[in-house]
Amino acid sequence: MASLNKLQSALGVRFTNPAVLEQALTHASFTNENPAGKAGDNERMEFLGDALLNLFVAEQLYRDFPDLPEGKLTEIRVSLIRQDTLAEKALLLKLGDYLLLGRGEDASGGRVKRNNLADAYEALTAAIYLDRGFETARSFVLAGFATDIHDIKEGKHSPNFKAMLQELTQANFKALPEYEIVESTGPDHDRIFCVSVSLGDVLLAVGSGKTRKAAESEAARAAYGKLSADSHSG
């Protein structure tokens, strides 16, 4: 594992207790192979970090977009705090170089696995909060998302509903959504596509658009909204 001093310099955060930072970078595979070690793995920190990320980003969106309704704010927040997004931010910090992994996980490419990187970013957020407090953690998160939020203000950011739906169905149902063209109508130069999205045998939603990609995105948006509403009401 690379020097934690180097990581702290990159973060702009100096830990009073470096053991907290080390735990945030400790994968469960490492603790399984080293049960006598003092530090636990980072799974509980992931839980806390996820909540903190959602809080800090939601608060900033609330302040920056006073005219947007709750549903739209939720869409933007979810589109920002996704596994792929968090993994990209972890890559920028080179978190993979600092992970403590079991031998098997390391050999199988664990340092570049997107789920490991995203989990480590969540855990790192929690570690900063636990060691340095609320404001330092908030500053770290908002600095990391500053460009993303700026792009939203400039109209350069569009939620990737297909990716959001895939993450949701994988997490909750261990299955991938499937898209199918239901029909296409109109002349070749002005065709409208209608696409369905299903999970197994269950039809989730239907969307339409001038291209298949646009229709799939609209179907994914509708399906994501439906599943999110169902999970909140249930």
Which residues are covered by each model-predicted region?
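Double-stranded RNA-binding/processing signature
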Residues: 1-234
